[in-house]
């Protein structure tokens, strides 16, 4: 599933193609919106909150938001008008066309149109967005409060829970826990400095946006410390990395760690 940085970069691409432009045609291949036309609407911008995309526009004197979510297989592509779509037609869920550019949403998991004033109904339950441009002390305090709300919960589960903080997926879970010296299966109480851990997660996400790809080691040739490096040597100590499931049965994800650098108890963020 695309994580917060990838969704943020998707929003940037949509903005480059459509922000400030008037839509000449729209096509919603989604049952609840099949008869909707937003032709004539002016796209303002696409914002994000964690893994959620919020394309805001003005139409007939109203401010509307197109809320989409990529989940596992969804993606947005922007192309010149008239160019062939880069994926099968049957996968198309949304088409937004301006005079020169077209944004096509493939296999989107969520597509809904709502008044911009009602965005809280679809993202209000989420934790603070680690890539929020106005991130400040208030966001950090709330993120820490949510993280510590269930101190016995496995840290990895808490970080993957978008109601704790928004934007972390399996990449940033594994990498944040590694650089913080905490095992992802350890309880939240194993984190000695939750503020520092969250700041590290935020900085890594910001770096990924800057580099347009996840890079946590500082080396673009070997960009990640532990993610998807099961059975490979730790880049720090040489110990063989391990992988294991995290989360409730039926919703388990795979995470990665170093048994030496990330003991099951303790940690030193």
What are the language-model segments listed below?
Residues 1-269:
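Structured catalytic/nucleic-acid-binding cores of DNA maintenance enzymes
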